[in-house]
Amino acid sequence: LSSLSNLVNNSGVVAADVTGVGTARDFLAAASYGLDKAIFGYGGSYSSLTNLVNNSGVVAADVTGVGTARRGPAAASYGTDKAIFGYGRTGSTLSMTNLVSSSGVVATDVTGVGTARAYLGAAGYGGDKAIFGYGETTLSMTNLVSNSGVVASDVTGVGTGRGYSAASGYGGDKALFGYGYTGSAISVTNLVSNSGVVAT
């Protein structure tokens, strides 16, 4: 396991390894918050630790975890300056979420909405909302998140069900899910409109 980080400049160029800070772990999630900062959280052997990242890309030491320790969650920004972690697994799959304030403080568990799952993707869309989607091993449903951090019930999945996908915003108000694993690695992508509709 590693705790290295790699900075990416505004041209998309990835820099060399930066010596790790905090607990080395895998299967964690990360999102931006506070307009210009980021947070890593959860992962490893069922951890709830977080690590804040300042607006220079410097990763801070571990912050004692809040909420259910788990691995395989997803995270996204919402509401322009906040973030949300959601889903994951311990011995079984989970559906709770944890909101992150504009100052990087993680709140306690919020009762889960939608299908419990892990190893899914999440991204911001629409300027101030978020979407969770897909999940281990062949799930394809999505859950929209309002600009106040409320997660909606399952939306019937579109596209290939898969786990271990990634997601990101693009174009200022849209999102994209890509890649994943169904039993073998796949390279499909699914675009998300600025109203949260997932395309085939």
Regions found by a protein language model. Name each.
Residues L1-T200:
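Polar, enzyme-active/binding microenvironments
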